[in-house]
Amino acid sequence: MPKFMLLQNYTPIEGVEPISSWAPEDINAHVAFQLALNNELVASGEFVDGQGLAGPELAKFVTFDGVGAPVVTDGPFPEAKELLAGYRIVDVESEARAVEIAAKTSAAPGPGGAPIRQPIEVRQVMGAPTPEL
């Protein structure tokens, strides 16, 4: 079965305040939704991994030319249009099933329980290169 990564980005969503400004009960409902979805995917045998990530203010970009010391730049990165907020990896029968899970993820509750319509990027996991390459 193919694996897909469902990527959630810190992308402004029209009409939805950033989660840092949500009421505690709205944050709790959002997290509970994500955990329930993970549990549903575990029960169906489709869940591989999923994690929420620390905010962009804690991120670091690292570049290295192979000589000397790497260059480390601390976040946040206002010039970046999208920064990864979290992901799920699912092992599903088809891309259509991955899209179905992404749609459910997109409808996670936000302030007042309204679906936030967060864009979810769906990408097939291709696996590691084989020695024949």
Tell me what each language-model feature is.
Residues 1-133:
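Conserved, structured core segments of small domains
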